[in-house]
């Protein structure tokens, strides 16, 4: 199934964090926090301003982004756990 977000929404796939610390300690699932980093999988066309013009989003498909701990709505699409959030929930793009 193809999913196209509307307006200024984006679809993000979480990037899983390491299961081991640098010292070699394995972190159990119960102690892990959900990662706050992800990859943009789909973007909407942008938000409309008062004149009805569409303002394109600053992020694009493939960007690695950081977002807040409670940002977005969790959904499952084609068996993948994804987040749908507004562009304003994204704190920044991680430089490659």
From Swiss-Prot:
It comes from the Bacteria. Its main location: cytoplasm. SUPFAM superfamilies: GroES-like. Keywords: Chaperone, Cytoplasm. InterPro entries: Chaperonin_GroES, Chaperonin_GroES_sf, Chaprnonin_Cpn10_CS, GroES-like_sf. GO terms for cellular component: cytoplasm. GO terms for molecular function: ATP binding; metal ion binding; protein folding chaperone; protein-folding chaperone binding; unfolded protein binding. CDD domains: cpn10. The keyword Cytoplasm applies. The keyword ATP-binding does not apply. PROSITE patterns: CHAPERONINS_CPN10. It is found in: Cytoplasm. Transmembrane segments: none annotated. SMART domains: Cpn10. One of its GO terms (biological process) is chaperone cofactor-dependent protein refolding. PANTHER family: 10 KDA HEAT SHOCK PROTEIN, CO-CHAPERONIN GROES. NCBIfam families: PRK00364.1-2 (NF001527), PRK00364.1-5 (NF001529), PRK00364.2-2 (NF001531), PRK00364.2-4 (NF001533), PRK00364.2-5 (NF001534). Heptamer of 7 subunits arranged in a ring. Interacts with the chaperonin GroEL. Together with the chaperonin GroEL, plays an essential role in assisting protein folding. The GroEL-GroES system forms a nano-cage that allows encapsulation of the non-native substrate proteins and provides a physical environment optimized to promote and accelerate protein folding. GroES binds to the apical surface of the GroEL ring, thereby capping the opening of the GroEL channel. Belongs to the GroES chaperonin family. This is Co-chaperonin GroES. It comes from Methylorubrum populi (strain ATCC BAA-705 / NCIMB 13946 / BJ001) (Methylobacterium populi). The lineage of its organism: Bacteria, Pseudomonadati, Pseudomonadota, Alphaproteobacteria, Hyphomicrobiales. The gene is groES.
């Amino acid at each position: 199934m193809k999913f196209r977000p509307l307006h200024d929404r984006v679809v993000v796939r979480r990037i899983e964090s390491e299961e081991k610390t640098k010292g070699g300690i394995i972190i159990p699932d119960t102690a892990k926090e959900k990662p706050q980093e992800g990859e943009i999988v789909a973007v909407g066309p942008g938000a409309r301003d008062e004149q009805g013009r569409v303002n394109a989003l600053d992020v694009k498909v493939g960007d690695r982004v950081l977002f807040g701990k409670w940002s977005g709505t969790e959904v499952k699409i084609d068996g993948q756990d994804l987040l749908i959030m507004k562009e304003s929930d994204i704190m920044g793009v991680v430089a490659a």
